[in-house]
Amino acid sequence: MQYKKPLVVSALAATSLAAYAPKDPWSTLTPSATYKGGITDYSSSFGIAIEAVATSASSVASSKAKRAASQIGDGQVQAATTTAAVSKKSTAAAVSQITDGQVQAAKSTAAAVSQITDGQVQAAKSTAAAVSQITDGQVQAAKSTAAAVSQITDGQVQAAKSTAAAASQISDGQVQATTSTKAAASQITDGQIQASKTTSGASQVSDGQVQATAEVKDANDPVDVVSCNNNSTLSMSLSKGILTDRKGRIGSIVANRQFQFDGPPPQAGAIYAAGWSITPEGNLALGDQDTFYQCLSGDFYNLYDKHIGSQCHEVYLQAIDLIDC
């Protein structure tokens, strides 16, 4: 895959040609290739949930409960590690962001990616929920939700280690799993929790076989999962291929290949700050690449666009609509 380089000449090193310097137009820091059918403008804010590439092929029959990425204060995005859920995916929780804008993944129950204060995106480690049993003995699994990635205060995005919802059993001994939903769950007057925009359930033909209907995605809105929104959830906007978080910071791949939010402008040395899209499958893409890497850092996973070490695993960043719960 070939990439565009900014029109600057640096005396430091040849590799600096692919990095951002403060005087450069950062919006040109984009891969040369684009994702076929990718959407570069999305009408509403959204989060991301972490989905391991190795397990995505089997997610139709047995999906994960996902937790959305969170964001801590520095802008890092974090994501939790997730376990596979018994039922088809339904509502998703978001990634969080920390204060410095970094995007990280924490060890989670299938929760959303968070963002810490510095803008990094991180994901947390997860746990699995136990199977329940109702009075007739049947075992059932509740509709799974995906938690959003969180963001800490520095802008990093992190994901926590996630838990998977367990199958339940009702009183007659049967083990059952419910269908998943895209929309947020509502509660009616008798106390039951219901979810709208459900995917079609499995049907049974005359010979007794159970078949599942293929899911059809809307080409104009490929995002088919929702998650509860909170203060640490990484909430992003996509316009003309540029990602911004709720503080207006720019989603970029920085010099160490980490995905985080800074600025504007992005931090010096940033490699990419544009060229983002949502794929027809509902995943976040950069250029023509829709896979990223979560790499363990203490209790959280930082997110990168390249494999940087032995503690890294290939993942999809699934786009999720965020709702108030």
Swiss-Prot record:
Belongs to the PIR protein family. The record marks 76, 102, 120, 138, 156, 174, 192, 209 as: Covalent attachment to cell wall glycan. Residues 1-18 form the signal peptide. PANTHER family: CELL WALL MANNOPROTEIN CIS3-RELATED (PTHR47254:SF1). One of its GO terms (molecular function) is structural constituent of cell wall. It is found in: Secreted, Cell wall. The record marks 67-68 as: Cleavage. Its main location: secreted. This is Cell wall mannoprotein PIR3. PROSITE patterns: PIR_REPEAT_1 (PS00929), PIR_REPEAT_2 (PS50256). GO terms for biological process: fungal-type cell wall organization. Covalently linked to beta-1,3-glucan of the inner cell wall layer via an alkali-sensitive ester linkage between the gamma-carboxyl group of glutamic acids, arising from specific glutamines within the PIR1/2/3 repeats, and hydroxyl groups of glucoses of beta-1,3-glucan chains. O-glycosylated. Extensively O-mannosylated. Keywords: Cell wall, Cell wall biogenesis/degradation, Cleavage on pair of basic residues, Glycoprotein, Repeat, Secreted, Signal. InterPro entries: PIR1-like_C, Yeast_CWMannoprotein_PIR, Yeast_PIR_rpt.
